[in-house]
Every structure is written in C-alpha cells, then in structure tokens.
Amino acid sequence: MIAVSYEKEVLSVSNVIRQISFTRINADEFSVYAKWSVKNYAEHLIKSGDEKFRFKARKAAKSEFMDIFPEGADSADNYLYIVKNEAGEKIGVIGYGKSPFEENAAFVTENIIKKEFRGKGYGKSALILLQEDAKEKGYAKMVLNCFKHTPVSYAMYEKNGFKVIEDYGGSVIMEKLLID
C-alpha cells in the first residue's frame, strides 16, 4: 500500500520500501545541480560509445541542459525535486518535464540518488512518487532515456513497468503508462 501526500511544494511517499519526500529545487540548489548535471551527462554520453560525443560531449550536454531548463529552476513545465530521506537528508535529485516528442507525456530529466543511498529502495520510492506526481498533473505516460552502461538503473526501470520503445545503441528510450 502506497500513501502519497501533497503539501505545498513537498511531496512524500511511504510504503514498505522507504519513506522519502520531495521539495522543489530552489535557485541556489539548481546552480550547484546544473554544473554537476552537465558534467555527469557529458560523461554518460562518452560512455555510451557514441564517438561523435568524445570531443563534443560537454558542449552537447550543456546545449541539451539549456534546452530543458532555459529559465533555470523556474523553467515552465519542468518539475525538478530534491529527494530527502526519512531523516530529511538530501539524498538525490529527480525530475521531469513536458515531453517535446509526445503529447501528454512526462519526460524524466533527472533521476540520481547519492551512491551511499543506492540499493536501499530510495530510487524505487523516488520513481514511484515521481510517477504519482506526473499522474496528478495530468500526464498519461512517463518516458525516459536510459544509458545501457547503467544496468542497475535499467533493471530498476524494467522492474517498475517501463518498456523499451527505441534502441539507439548506447541508450534506450523507455516508457510506462500512468493511467489504467
């Protein structure tokens, strides 16, 4: 049984996995996150094996980041959250935005849990809460990109009902219907 509560800008979920909550990312947190995210995404592009990104990865990552978040933390149709554990510690960042490719679909823009909290159910709990949030905002589907060199993430998405709809070699696009 999952209990979801929405209080102002705080969301929380509890079930047998983990008690977590979300708060909307603020401008200061976004500034730190943006620097990390561009670097991290560039590294993933390189690891995905696409040779064209070897020398242009950082530029490509920054360009894509700016397309997604043109107004920073306040970008329209984007919901970026800090994930907090039971003790209120900041343990990750997760978010989605309106898909530029499909009508009525939420596209996951970030899903990262700090290493020391991985493998303990926090990622799954955050994904469940993110889906509930998107569903509450009227989205019928959730879509995401998953790099193939991240098998733990791929397995988590698959176990949570996401299906591969496109394969790009180094990454796949996965989706899940949010409505019954």
Language model features with spans:
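Terminal substrate-recognition subdomain of acyl/acetyltransferases
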Residues: I2-N15, I173-D180
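Acetyl-CoA-dependent GNAT
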Residues: N15-K115, L129, D133, E166-G169, ...
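Conserved beta-strand-loop-alpha-helix junction that forms the acyl-donor binding cleft
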Residues: K114, R118, L144-S153, G170-E175
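Short polybasic/polar patches that bind polyanions
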Residues: R118, K135, E158
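Conserved GNAT acetyl-CoA-binding A-motif
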Residues: K135-N145
